[in-house]
Amino acid sequence: MNARRILLVILFSLSVGLLSVLGFWQLDRAEQKRERYENFLERHQSSELRLEKNSTLADLKWRKAVLRGSYEEINLLLDNRVYMKQSGYEVLTPFKLNDGNAVLVNRGWVSNRGSRDFVPSISIAPQILEIKGYFGPPPVVGIRLFGHEKFELTEKLGDSIIRIQKIDPSSLGYVSNGKSLLKEVFYLEGSQVGALKVDRKLPGSGSEKHEAYATQWFSMAAILAFIGLWNLLRKKAPDE
């Protein structure tokens, strides 16, 4: 076997090995996604928590809960949210618990009626009540700008309405009158007081995507291995 053929064998072997490693990596990612999804289902299907004060639980993510307290007067409009091909906002309102601390409640979607000058009517009369929903991460949207540590591109539309491009519960003290906020957002059920247009889809596992990628990598590895072996045997035949 001459040096050229040896080099080709090495290159084919390395390529097949690399493609196989990528395939196994995608399978590992799929397994991680499945485990994460199983954890989500377990938490989301567990019994409801009842919170009247800021919880000391380490992780409330995806837990269903009943909150007792009252809505604050201020409302946040999370910009550039589209529903049924219509532009609008997600409305987030601090909800004061009985101990004075607060939870940021995602009340759903509202239309801007095709104009950024339109200010929707979303206020709620302050009253003690109970609301149901579940905890989850804040909506992901917007681009972080240099020098903005709280809200990016904030815009006051009225005495109690602020339009924002990105949200971070850890920096909401000046919006919630200095009250501490849970790090998770509370997603309100559609039948509750204060709910707007609520049409949320809970996340799937996402493992199918990684399994499909793994199949692609393994298929490419198999095809490349076949081509390499076929060329090796074909060139070797005349020498025998």
Predicted regions and their residues:
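Surface-exposed, charge/polar-rich loops and edge strands
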Residues: 1-54, 60-240
